[in-house]
Amino acid sequence: MPKAKPALLPEEQKALAAEAVKRMNEVRQALANPQAREDYLDFIIDFTVCEIGYKTLLERYMKSRGRACTVEDLTIYPNQVPHVLKYADIDLDEDDIKTIFNKYVGKTRKHEARGMRNVLAHEPTSKVLNELAKRKQDYMDAMQRLISAINNEAQTSTN
């Protein structure tokens, strides 16, 4: 890779690198706690399972509307979720839909599962991991209800 002329002065480069190291170390330290690491992995795994399940439904829904796309290209819009679930005959209550697919709760800026996943992917600080620990069971319960609803529909549709 060709070496471009730096846009920062040497002391600014050093300060920027030091800031990056500090933030990387904060993430490492936050995830060094075994319980925080377990919560993180449990949540990320279940959210990923829910997301691929939902995006599979969304992909078919979009194709039925004449919009060809792939799962990788899909964006989740919370206001679209009830329509997609109805299309696939998946029964999930409004609170679970909000808990899984909204980014934040109203003006509180408290993370819902999708927002939590985003912040965990970009900067899982101790503060965020503490919020996850407090809300993990709510997230996991809502996600499990979606997973079960999709599984139940798959079984009833084939019987």
What does each model-found stretch correspond to?
Residues 2-95:
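Amphipathic alpha-helical interface elements
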Residues 95-159:
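Charge-enriched, short contiguous segments at helix-coil
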